[in-house]
Amino acid sequence: MASLRSAHPADRIIVALDGMAPEQALAFAAQVEGLRWVKVGLELFVQAGPEVVAQLREQGLRVFLDLKFHDIPATMAGACRRAAALGAELITVHACAGSEALKAAQAAAVEGAQGAGQPAPTLLAVTVLTSWEEQRLQRELAITQGIAERVPALAQLSATAGIGGCVCSPLEAAALRAQHPEPFALVTPGIRPKGAAVGDQARVMGPAEAIAAGASQLVIGRPITKAEDPSAAFAACCGELLG
């Protein structure tokens, strides 16, 4: 992914279409003034099918397909090949799948995009989900490595495998940016604009602070999708990035 340092704020905000029926998601995306990027997650993709990507792109939107592929190398490669052919520009994979699967996914994504006449997408490795807290990782998954050590290790594994970026908490963005200069992409959920509730995210930060910490793009959902005036909420988020 090219550097977004001088990009318009709207290019740096990805609105998550989570918890919406397909018709609702398409209508919502069409009504938000200035919107450029949307995130399609598992729930919407399972409901609507692959055609939702094409429908959103027909509305002039760029699509982050957040399906977090995690499987054996051949299966991950096949999934990424198909996802890239749809025209999704960002696609998530789990770093924990390992280097062999990550390399296979990256090669297949390029192949799938080329075969469909689409630009090659950026694969984003998921390190540690922002809903996890360190104590719960230790208690439930027996992972003794702290988040501060685990996230950089998984990001390095992914970068070495040729993955173009990672998804991380904004709290880890500064350390990862120091480790991985642009154009390595850092896409951060867990973004809460001024006055927004934290919700189910355990590791959060404001939009301007996340960009200053090194994030490339921000994923924002409910503070925009549940707002009384989504266009105004989106504009306010863009305004926070402008200072």
Swiss-Prot record:
GO terms for cellular component: cytosol. Disulfide bonds: none annotated. Signal peptide: none annotated. SMART domains: OMPdecase. GO terms for molecular function: orotidine-5'-phosphate decarboxylase activity. Pathway: Pyrimidine metabolism; UMP biosynthesis via de novo pathway; UMP from orotate: step 2/2. GO terms for biological process: 'de novo' pyrimidine nucleobase biosynthetic process; 'de novo' UMP biosynthetic process. The keyword Lyase applies. Pfam families: OMPdecase. CDD domains: OMP_decarboxylase_like (cd04725). InterPro entries: Aldolase_TIM, OMPdecase, OMPdecase_AS, OMPdecase_bac, OMPdeCOase_dom, RibuloseP-bd_barrel. Homodimer. Belongs to the OMP decarboxylase family. Type 1 subfamily. This is Orotidine 5'-phosphate decarboxylase.
